[in-house]
Amino acid sequence: MTTFSPREIVSELDRYIVGQHEAKRAVAIALRNRWRRQQLEPDLRDEVMPKNILMIGPTGVGKTEISRRLAKLAGAPFIKVEATKFTEVGYVGRDVEQIIRDLVEVGIGLVREKKRAEVQAKAHMSAEERVLDALVGATASPATRDSFRKKLRDGQLDDKEIDIEVADTGSGMPGGFEIPGMPGANIGVLNLSEMFGKAMGGRTKKVRTTVKDSYKELVRDESDKLIDNEAIQREAVRSAEDDGIVFLDEIDKIAARDGGMGAGVSREGVQRDLLPLVEGTTVSTKYGPVKTDHILFIASGAFHVSKPSDLLPELQGRLPIRVELRPLTKEDFRRILTEPEASLIRQYKALMETEDLKLDFTDDAIDALADVAVHLNSTVENIGARRLQTVMERVLDEISYNASDRAGVSVTIDAAYVREHVGDLANNTDLSRFIL
């Protein structure tokens, strides 16, 4: 897992997300506390529980983006789920324990990649031997093999096509059956296919590919022969238990809004099912039982219709750290357009450059774009930074359409150009409701 300090985590998030310093600080501290806990004595380590976070803020201000970037930074099993996808146990749909099963699967993938990297050199040598077998046959003389090995390493044979046999990882059966009342619903089918695969020595398939492309498949194949699957599973379960992070998006959508019956009952049921998960329980997975006591939960929601106090009191108590994300201002929109590494303006410039069309935005154009976005958010519906994409598409519609006919041309976009293309719509509220 990551050993970044909280300040380093925040500065890394700053590269992609504008503002929201308080939310970044909260997740940075929570992430660093995972590492701090690992340094403690075992007795005390078991007692230190993660402080779960609730992020509150309107749509389009960076809640989900913070989680996406955090996942890449974490270096630990991380899963983002929408709370609305789950239903109360006994209803048709996914139950909340599936979150933990998915988290373990993510852990398996992370640990496997790490183990593959450790045996990379050895696997590469074995892969080279298999490529030589495909090129000159297993019975070729050492002199012939050495001659071809030299050509292979010099890249002279990169484009030559060969037939290789690799493990067939695709299951012949569908992903599994949802069996009511059975935890880990689809484990039956997966275990059966694994058992048959092992009994028959593992299925292989023939693939025709170039020498250069074959290495990727063969190195992975050889790496998997060198690593111990049971050790990977044990390590992944431990990693999910100690370092796992679950990001629960749209938590406000399952908050009870009224005391009535109907769908609200099921929503409250999902909250009740989440309680033991967040508090700490044991979930059975096909890799063995997984304890959720030390998994960090970060919940987020816009809370437009409901309030955080509409959540079950027990669930509120299990989300002790509250962070409020503020709505975006005109200055924020300006910064979003220009500052992040993959800012919208940079993206559009790069897209147009593929057609050999040079795009330039003046400072007053950026001001005008931010003005239009703020105006529309205040008069139509506040959808945060996502409004900029709509406005940009509208402004650049004509340029994008004709770009292939204007190769070698330079286009400068200024405030007048922006107003000409979205000014009327932005001022006409009835029209902008439908178009922007």
Swiss-Prot record:
| A GO term, aspect molecular function | ATP binding
Where does it localize?
A: Cytoplasm
- Sorted alphabetically, which SMART domains does this protein's record hold? AAA, ClpB_D2-small
Record-listed ATP binding positions: V18, G60, V61, G62, K63, T64, E65, D249, E314, R386
For biological process, the GO terms are: protein unfolding; proteolysis involved in protein catabolic process
Q: Which UniProt keywords apply?
A: ATP-binding, Chaperone, Cytoplasm, Nucleotide-binding, Stress response
Which InterPro entries does the entry mention?
A: AAA+_ATPase, ATP-dep_Clp_protease_ClpX, ATPase_AAA_core, Clp_ATPase_C, HslU, P-loop_NTPase
> Which is a Gene Ontology cellular component entry for this protein?
HslUV protease complex
Q: Which cysteines in this chain are paired by disulphide bridges? A: none
Gene3D superfamilies in the record: 1.10.8.60, P-loop containing nucleotide triphosphate hydrolases
Assembly and oligomerization: A double ring-shaped homohexamer of HslV is capped on each side by a ring-shaped HslU homohexamer. The assembly of the HslU/HslV complex is dependent on binding of ATP.
| HAMAP family named in the record | HslU
Task: Please describe what this protein does.
Answer: ATPase subunit of a proteasome-like degradation complex; this subunit has chaperone activity. The binding of ATP and its subsequent hydrolysis by HslU are essential for unfolding of protein substrates subsequently hydrolyzed by HslV. HslU recognizes the N-terminal part of its protein substrates and unfolds these before they are guided to HslV for hydrolysis.
Question: Which family, according to the similarity comment?
Answer: Belongs to the ClpX chaperone family. HslU subfamily.
Q: What is this protein called?
A: ATP-dependent protease ATPase subunit HslU
Q: Which organism is it from?
A: Rhizobium rhizogenes (strain K84 / ATCC BAA-868) (Agrobacterium radiobacter)
Show the taxonomic lineage: Bacteria, Pseudomonadati, Pseudomonadota, Alphaproteobacteria, Hyphomicrobiales
User: Source gene?
Assistant: hslU
